[in-house]
Amino acid sequence: MKSGISGFMQKQLSTIIFLGFFLFYLPTIVHAQAPKVTGHDIRFKVKGYKDSTAIIAHYYGDNQYIPKDTAKFDGKGNLQFKGKKELPEGVYLLVLPKNRYVEFLVGEQVQTLEFDTSDAIATMKVSVGQENQIFYSYQKTMSDKAKQAAPIKAKLGKTKNADSTATLKKELEAIDKEVKAFREKLFTDNPKTLAVKLFKAAQEPEVPEAPILSNGRKDSTFQFRYYKSHFLDNIDLGDDRMVRTPIFHGKVEQYLTKLTLQIPDSINKEADYVLKKASKSKEVFKYLVWWITNNYEKSQIMGMDAVFVHMAKNYYLNGKAFWVDSAVVNKIRDRAKILDPILIGKKAPNMFLTDSAGKLFTLDGFKAKSTILYFCDPNCGHCQKETPKLYEFYEKNKKRGIDVYAVCIDRKPDDWKKFIREKKLNWTNVWDSYTATDFKNNYDIYSTPVIYLLDANKKILAKRIGVEQLEDFYDNYFKDKIGGATRE
């Protein structure tokens, strides 16, 4: 038994709204007056339970289960959750034994709900609590009308008679018209309720036909652009309650990760747009700043550290992240300070290193169409395996203008020289003989090996790329950027 917006509503409501085949009717609701209390007092009568324990929990972002209170049945199916503190408003779950649950809304702090576990939606009775009266009446009616419309749809799928088809379509069109009218009335009459905001948030944009361009063809990108530009129209990101719903996180995540091109500039622009919409809600804003920063900091997609730096500069380091203490801000500042100079597209910091004979080789002075900047440690087991693979690639591709600037980060020259001899590394091998280079802070080297790819002007093209990825990268790079340099 699972009921509520994440169960019935997300699976059924979206289908109903998309097809527009189902009529709902919201009966006139008589609102019982809840007594004024301090804190919360939420009561359930559940048929089928006597001596068990139940929990109420709420959604938060992408986490379904944040426990808030526990109670025991009284032997007659009655539960009471009562406390001196008010519960934060949002979508809650009454979690029953055997992982069964029912969803309900906390809008009012005093509520009384009664249902049978065999079908919570059909049997739900709400005697106190406007939010849940709307929430369950809407779902029940939608469910009933879906069943009512199903035979019409089935007939339409089977009939081959043109007149019958036209008649059935008219019936569905009439239902669709009534659906829209009643839905509009519900939204108009109860605009500030969480229930209505949930129903609206579940709606998808209705995309019109693409316009015809001057060349006589349809605008092939119009529908996607329209869908994206209106995707967040119906979700109120300025309402604190939305952060405790099952719709909120998925909606924003889809917008930022599926509808937005996954390159830093695009993500940063859209993140700012979303956060501007959330600026009136401290809770939504707080969650989204945290989630966007955390999501892209952990991303395995190359270059997404630019999103972290953007979030750090524009939200954490300027005081907008009001919930973060100074210790956390300092850590974020330190991390952003390291990453900012070595983002893809920026010029790599110069280095002044020497070879085994003491000859100086600066990175800026290293001439190549593309430089493989390779950080390694002769005592690193992974370097022992990867270096021969890289050298093999280098031998095959050096005539394309690719050269290697191999940096030993270890301070023991004897181990390094032995490593060069044993691996027969006939490329530019350098180390910090002056012990003046901070590899960790200059290039974010906390483990080895690490590869950076640079263009002829030492602009960073890629970083932390595997040897096995070099072939494809350079095939595309030389084709697109240099004009098809070939292997010889």
Where are these regions (language model features)?
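Short, internal strand/loop/helix patches
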Residues: 349, 420-457
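Short active-site neighborhood of thiol/selenol oxidoreductases, capturing the structured segment around
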Residues: 361-390, 403-405
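Structured, charged N-terminal subsegments at the starts of enzyme catalytic cores
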Residues: 220-283, 289
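Structural microenvironment flanking redox-active thiols in thiol-disulfide oxidoreductases
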Residues: 384-421, 435-441
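N-proximal helix/coil linker or "cap" segments that precede and/or mark the start of modular domains
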Residues: 298-354, 359, 364-366, 395, ...
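Bacterial Sec-dependent N-terminal signal peptides
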Residues: 1-44, 488
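A non-transmembrane, solvent-exposed segment enriched in polar/low-complexity residues
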Residues: 32-191, 201-202, 206-238
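Non-catalytic, surface beta->alpha helical segment in thiol-disulfide oxidoreductase systems
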Residues: 93, 447-450, 456-487
